[in-house]
From Swiss-Prot:
Cross-referenced SUPFAM superfamilies: DNA repair protein MutS, domain I, DNA repair protein MutS, domain II, DNA repair protein MutS, domain III, P-loop containing nucleoside triphosphate hydrolases
GO molecular function, one term: ATP-dependent DNA damage sensor activity
Matching PANTHER family: DNA MISMATCH REPAIR PROTEIN MSH1, MITOCHONDRIAL, DNA MISMATCH REPAIR PROTEIN MUTS FAMILY MEMBER
An example Gene Ontology CC term for this record: cytosol
Amino acids binding ATP: 596-603
Gene that produces this protein: mutS
Matching InterPro entries: DNA_mismatch_repair_MutS (IPR005748), DNA_mismatch_repair_MutS-lik_N (IPR007695), DNA_mismatch_repair_MutS/MSH (IPR017261), DNA_mismatch_repair_MutS_C (IPR000432), DNA_mismatch_repair_MutS_clamp (IPR007861), DNA_mismatch_repair_MutS_core (IPR007696), DNA_mismatch_repair_MutS_N (IPR016151), DNA_mismatch_repair_MutS_sf (IPR036187)
Record keywords: ATP-binding, DNA damage, DNA repair, DNA-binding, Nucleotide-binding
GO biological process: mismatch repair
Protein name (database record): DNA mismatch repair protein MutS
Record-stated family: Belongs to the DNA mismatch repair MutS family.
Known function: This protein is involved in the repair of mismatches in DNA. It is possible that it carries out the mismatch recognition step. This protein has a weak ATPase activity.
């Protein structure tokens, strides 16, 4: 920062700024927030503001400066927060009119991406995550300051931490050191480094020291930045990753759980399909259920019972949803009360919500499902609080809490007297206007008011000469009018303004006292919010089940899906046009090798199964005529091809990295979906890798797997791997054109119909004709090498190798030295890569 002549104000600025080097300091000067030096230069550029100079551009050391009006600062602050910056709000803590010299100032709040309370997406959480490394175990504390919720878990590796953060996509992450910061910078999420911690009884639910340390880091950060009561924070809830089906960011993206892959929007995702919730807090809970499907049969069954109860009783379902449509976001209303930012409209929304509770509870009297009965028991009507809010607040109060108009007549005798005095004074002034018009004969005479001159009598210049000398005292001359006052008018003005100021002050004091009273109900109101959120989600799942004709799945040890459907794709097709398919997997049939033409629906079939499995484990009904499913601990997917441009990884490297995750972390209780593995490299490399991966999964993991491939040669593996079965997606030729039937049948596909797909894409006719000629020549030559049919799982002692390199002795020598039985698929990939490089040099 440049050297400048330090006035008392600038000394104050430097002193405050030194404590907040990582935030833009919004320094209050009168009606503006001003920024100086580098803060001003960056903010002016980011927000396209005019950059000026505090001491004039001609000064020897001009001070860069920009500013925003305090009444519209929220707009600018939001833009900076969304860009990942922090903002420190520095307010005047003394009345400038009552202070001689420099006004005291202090930072009242630091707003960060993870603590921003305003302009929130209703159905999205705003997560702030703290990570603490305790002896190689990583505690994760995830909090949402806008609702007061927080969760704790422990992870065992940096890779697991990175996956967790990529899956959560929090708004901000706090770490203790540069090592973790370096690990997480690749995510692009705003990071803060902090070493201070603060103990809290809210961390009593922590399962280990790593979780406790992470929460204390989170709590210290909130205390330091928010500088206010955090009474709305709820006790942290610890969970084990193993309690839920694990879905990493890659799987969520491939299955389009939360965003459409095509548009990046919520529309077109599974979440969008399921979201029939009517409250914001229900929408947030639904997303969390989808992020963490259950891995306990009892929890799933309890939810299914509740959904079934609501599916069977459509009148109850409809009536409950109608009631919930009039329920506001209690979680965030309570948070605003705890923060001290709730206004009268917020409390009216809370009151209106509480007044719906007797009806909701009455409707739930007849339910049979245990979860619904528990919800009914947790619904307190808060009659005392509701009546107090009804008595205190008008139905449509203003947003501002300092300009009156909030408190209902009859709540405070003192306030009523002040308001009556103000009303009487204004009535006197209204009468004065009529009286003076008659007395002067000037019909255009009027009484006006502004904040500078107060009340005045205004007469046009043309009529001013009609006034008696000395009748009024001239106060202000305008271009076309004269403004006057009288002693009596000023006396009434003092009475009116005095009553108005006192009434506004009293209203504010009454409102603050009321808000503090509401704060004492924080914990039971948060329990009410949790119950209503769960009811809302269960209703939403019931609505979808009834509307889409879903069935209740049965939890078993095997997979048996009859006429299953893709939940999202079927909704964009005309009713009845989606082609449903069966799927069976059990202990003897654990893997399906899927072949079929491009565009025939192989990937859709795979995604369909995964989505049905997820729906089962969130407690939902599923799109099928019947379904029996096991509990999956995790779903791994490699579907689609995409380069990772940020880290410089090719399509093939991304493919292998994701495959490595599956083959090294999957268990026999996992579900693996691998689509067209090996297409990112040469034909023989890809084919060899695909076969090795299939064999490894079958022999070493035993996970239920769907493996689609364009290598038709792999279908011979059915003969040597007992747990593998071939299926194909059927297509037929009709009048020289391919017709995709989207039906999955046993056995292998005999053709890929690639040229037909090219025709559908409307490639030039000459190109298509040439492709047919080349294909005919290749097929007649029959030069395609076949996979060795003796390839087998581990019980086979020797595996013959393909003769891929006929003329390169060096490559052949390296190839013969490879011990394939001791290699995993990733090691095989590396070996093949080295062989390929050697062959290129030869």
């Amino acid at each position: 920062m440049q050297e400048v002549h330090q006035t008392p104000m600038m000394k104050q600025y430097f002193s405050i700024k030194a404590d907040y080097p990582d935030a833009f300091l919004f320094y209050r000067l009168g009606d503006f927030y001003e920024l100086f030096f580098e803060d001003a230069q960056i903010v002016a550029k980011e927000l396209e503001l005019t950059l000026t100079s505090k001491n004039g551009k001609q000064a020897e050391h001009p001070i860069p400066m920009c500013g925003v009006p305090h009444h519209s600062a929220a707009i600018y602050i939001e833009q900076l927060i969304e860009k990942g910056f922090n903002v420190a709000i520095c307010e005047q803590t003394e009345d400038p009119k009552a202070t001689k010299g420099l006004v005291k100032r202090e930072v009242i709040q630091v707003i960060t991406p993870g603590t921003y309370m305003a302009s929130l997406s209703e159905k999205e959480n705003r997560y702030l995550v703290a990570i603490s490394d305790v002896a190689g175990r990583f505690g994760i504390a995830r909090g949402d300051v806008t609702t007061g919720e927080s969760w704790l878990t422990t992870l065992s590796s940096e890779e697991a931490v990175l996956r967790e953060i990529e899956g959560l996509l929090p708004n901000e992450v706090i770490v203790e050191d540069e090592r973790l910061a370096d690990l997480l910078r690749q995510t692009g999420i705003p990071l803060s480094i902090q070493v201070d911690k603060r103990e809290s009884t809210l961390a009593q639910g922590a399962k280990d020291e790593a979780q406790r340390s992470a929460f204390e880091l989170l709590f210290a950060y909130l205390t330091k930045t928010q500088k206010r009561s955090l009474d709305h924070l709820q006790p942290a809830v610890a969970y084990e990753v193993e309690q839920h089906m694990q879905l990493d960011a890659n799987t969520a993206r491939n299955l389009e759980l939360f965003r459409s892959a095509r548009s990046g929007e919520r529309k077109g995702s599974l979440l969008s399909l399921l979201d029939e919730t009517t409250t914001a807090m229900g929408g947030r809970l639904l997303k969390r259920w989808l992020e963490q499907p259950l891995y306990t049969e009892q929890g799933i069954r309890e939810r299914q019972d509740a959904v079934e109860n609501l599916v069977d009783d459509f009148m109850l379902r409809d009536q409950l949803q109608e009631e919930l449509k009039r329920v506001y976001d209690i979680e965030r209303l309570v948070a605003k009360v705890g923060y001290g930012t709730a206004n009268a409209r917020d409390l009216v929304q809370l009151r209106d919500t509480l007044e719906r509770m007797p009806s909701v509870r009455s409707l739930l009297q007849t339910v049979k499902a245990d979860r619904l009965q528990q919800i009914e028991q947790n619904l307190d009507s808060f009659e005392t609080l509701s009546e107090q809010l009804r008595a205190a607040l008008v139905d449509s109060p203003p947003i501002s809490t300092k300009e009156g108009g909030m408190i209902r007549h009859g709540y405070s005798d003192e306030l009523d007297e002040l308001l009556e005095a103000k009303a009487n004074g204004k009535s006197w002034i209204a009468n004065l206007e009529q009286q003076e018009r008659i007395a002067t004969g000037i019909k255009s005479l009027k009484v006006g008011y502004n904040r500078v001159f107060g009340y005045y009598l205004e007469v046009t210049k043309a009529n001013a000469k009609l006034l008696e000398e000395g009748r009024y005292e001239r106060k202000q001359t305008l271009t076309n009018a004269e403004r006057y006052i009288t002693p009596e008018l000023k006396e009434k003005e003092a009475l009116i303004l005095g009553a108005e100021e006192k009434s506004c002050t009293l209203e504010y004091d009454l409102f603050v006292a009321l808000r503090e009273e509401v704060k004492t109900y924080t914990k039971p109101l948060q329990q009410l919010a949790r119950s209503l959120s769960e009811l809302d989600v269960l209703l939403a799942l019931a609505v979808v089940a009834e509307k889409r004709e879903y069935v209740r799945p049965v939890t078993t040890s095997h997979v048996q899906i009859e006429r299953g459907r893709h939940p999202v794709i079927e909704t964009v097709l005309p009713r009845g046009e989606y082609v449903a398919n069966d799927l069976t997997l059990d202990d003897t049939r654990q893997m399906l090798l899927i072949t079929g033409p491009n565009m025939s629906g192989k990937s859709t079939y795979m995604r369909q199964f995964a989505l049905i499995a997820i729906l089962h484990q969130i407690g939902s009904f599923v799109p099928a005529e019947a379904a029996e499913l096991p509990l999956f601990d995790r779903i791994f997917t490699r579907i689609g091809a995409a380069d990772d441009l940020v880290s410089g990884q090719s399509t093939f490297m991304v493919e292998m990295t994701e495959t490595r995750q599956a083959v090294t972390e999957a268990t026999s209780n996992s579900l693996i979906l691998l689509d067209e593995i090996g297409r990112g490299t040469s034909t023989y490399d890809g084919m060899a890798l695909a076969q090795a991966i299939v064999e490894y999964i079958a022999s070493s993991i035993g996970a239920k797997t769907l493996f689609s491939t364009h290598y038709h040669e792999l279908t011979v593996l059915e003969d040597s791997i007992p747990s593998l079965e071939n299926v194909h997606v059927r297509a037929i030729e009709r009048d020289g054109r391919v017709v995709f039937l989207h039906e999955v049948h046993p056995g292998r596909a005999d053709k890929s119909y690639g040229i037909h797909v090219a025709e559908l894409a409307e490639l030039p006719d000459s190109l298509i004709d040439r492709a047919r000629t080349i294909l005919s020549e290749l097929e007649s030559e029959a030069t395609k090498p076949a996979l060795n049919e003796q390839s087998a799982p581990p019980q086979v002692e020797e595996v013959s190798q393909l003769s891929l390199f006929e003329s390169n002795d060096a490559v052949r020598e390296q190839l013969l030295k490879l011990d394939l039985l001791a290699m995993n698929p990733i090691e095989a990939m590396q070996a093949l890569y080295e062989l390929q490089q050697t062959a290129k040099k030869g």
